[in-house]
């Protein structure tokens, strides 16, 4: 039995254990039927030809978790933002962990999605926002919609600015083999509201602290979908940290719908994973909208990360800014495919798109394709990409100043990515990412971390 057939046959059993919301049930049923028609993508699909997704679609993968694994705080504390208070939604192997989470319904709803789907109180919100902006022809989005249950639900009311950031933390315990996880996040910011969200992926095994290890273990495939709705004048800073085990894979689909005068920024930091695919989609539906996408990718060994971005300008007087940096060592590979669409009605658009890549390894490679589709005539749009290596003259200069070659390469590599990092508004998060970068580069950068 193929993985596709196995998942389709698992759907009825999943629904028996799911919530009773009729709208969500209809969405799941339609999604699994559409997934059954189109199946998984392969290299014949234009948007997947550089990403070998087939190699992680193991037939042994299952959506059913056998048991809940309890993890000691000492083993996961470094995964949290340190030094500040935060709301937390912690998922261990795709299951909500109330012990390490910190949720609230005071002033805002920050809780687990399954509790909302099961509660009639939220039926109007679910009917209005859930599954409204996803691509219904994208295989992994359909699969997530078929099995969506656990994840984060965040609803910030009108004119509320959250007093502390929100963390969504996915932890792979290593306690079960062959899991295919389907976390689903629904984020709603009402008119004039403001929030900061940090979503991260980690593995206990990769940090040598998993209490579970056994022969024949198959790493999980995490298929995440996030829907974000920003009403007028809302403001969101959204950060993604993907620092998982080198053999663990992540498919991340994020859809952001913005109303007039709203601002959304999304920073993606891809540091770990076997196959990582990020589909980031912004839909601008109103005037004076600002959309910001920035990312840093640092890979080694045989890792592969694929960034696909879309900004759809459907209204005039809006801006979008994309800047992605990639650093590839050993035999790692990367993809950047960025697309900006400007409708005919969307005059006075200012759109910028840039992808710069540094090949540190002799056998590393990257495929990059920035695109513009412009149907309006009064716009200011630009795009570009570069692929290169470390500047030999700069490296020589640092060595003449008594800096060892390894440290000199580390300093130049850090400087290459630094301007993206400097746009992180949360100091504690910026420090955390600096530490990860220093570890990935493998040198002491001399910063006070």
Say what each PLM segment does.
Residues 1-142, 326-329:
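N-terminal amphipathic, basic helical "cap/leader" segment at the start of enzyme domains
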Residues 15-18, 420, 424:
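Short amphipathic alpha-helical interaction patches enriched in hydrophobic/aromatic residues
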Residues 40-42, 413-423:
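Short, surface-exposed loop/turn segments at secondary-structure boundaries that line and modulate
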Residues 48, 411-412:
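Residue-level "edge-of-site" marker
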Residues 99, 103, 109, 113-403, ...:
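Conserved beta-strand/loop scaffold segments within soluble protein domains that form the structured core
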């Amino acid at each position: 039995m193929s993985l596709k057939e196995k998942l389709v046959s698992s759907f009825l059993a999943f629904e028996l254990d799911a919530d009773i919301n009729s709208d969500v049930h209809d969405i799941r049923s339609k999604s699994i039927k559409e997934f059954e028609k189109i199946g998984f993508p392969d290299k014949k699909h234009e948007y997947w030809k550089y990403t070998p997704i087939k190699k992680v679609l193991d037939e042994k993968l299952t959506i059913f978790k056998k048991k809940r694994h309890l993890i000691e705080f000492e083993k996961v504390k470094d995964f949290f933002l340190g030094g500040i208070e935060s709301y937390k939604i912690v998922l261990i192997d795709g299951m909500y962990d109330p012990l390490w989470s910190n949720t609230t319904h005071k002033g805002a709803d920050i809780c687990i999605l399954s509790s909302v789907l099961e509660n009639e109180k939220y039926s109007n919100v679910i009917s209005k926002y859930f599954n409204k902006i996803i691509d219904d022809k994208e295989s992994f989005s359909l699969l997530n919609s078929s099995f969506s249950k656990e994840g984060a639900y965040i609803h910030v009311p009108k004119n509320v600015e959250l007093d502390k950031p929100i963390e969504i933390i996915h932890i792979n315990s290593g306690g079960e083999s062959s899991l295919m996880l389907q976390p689903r996040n629904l984020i709603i910011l009402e008119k004039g509201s403001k929030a900061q969200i940090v979503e991260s992926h980690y593995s206990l095994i990769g940090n040598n602290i998993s209490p579970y290890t056994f022969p024949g273990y198959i790493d999980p495939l995490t298929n995440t979908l996030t829907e974000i709705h920003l009403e007028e004048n809302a403001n969101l800073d959204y950060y993604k940290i993907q620092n998982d085990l080198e053999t663990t894979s992540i498919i991340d689909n994020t859809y952001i719908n913005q109303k007039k005068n709203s601002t959304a920024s999304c920073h993606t930091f891809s540091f770990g994973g076997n196959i990582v695919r990020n589909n980031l989609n912004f839909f601008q539906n109103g005037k004076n909208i600002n959309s910001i996408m920035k990312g840093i990718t640092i890979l080694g060994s045989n890792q592969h990360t694929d960034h696909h971005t879309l900004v759809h300008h459907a209204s005039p007087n809006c801006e979008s800014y994309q800047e992605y940096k990639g650093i590839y060592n050993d035999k790692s590979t990367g993809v950047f495919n960025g697309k900006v669409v400007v409708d005919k009605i969307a005059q006075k658009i200012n759109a910028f798109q840039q992808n710069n890549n540094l090949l540190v390894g002799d056998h590393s490679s990257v495929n990059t394709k920035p695109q513009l589709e412009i149907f309006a005539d009064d716009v200011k749009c630009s795009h570009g990409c570069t692929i290169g290596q470390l500047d030999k003259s700069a490296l020589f200069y640092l060595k003449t100043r008594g800096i060892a070659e390894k440290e000199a390469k580390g300093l130049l590599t850090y400087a290459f990515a630094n301007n993206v990092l400097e746009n992180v508004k949360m100091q504690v998060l910026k420090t955390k990412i600096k530490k990860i970068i220093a570890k990935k580069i493998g040198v002491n950068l001399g910063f006070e971390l």
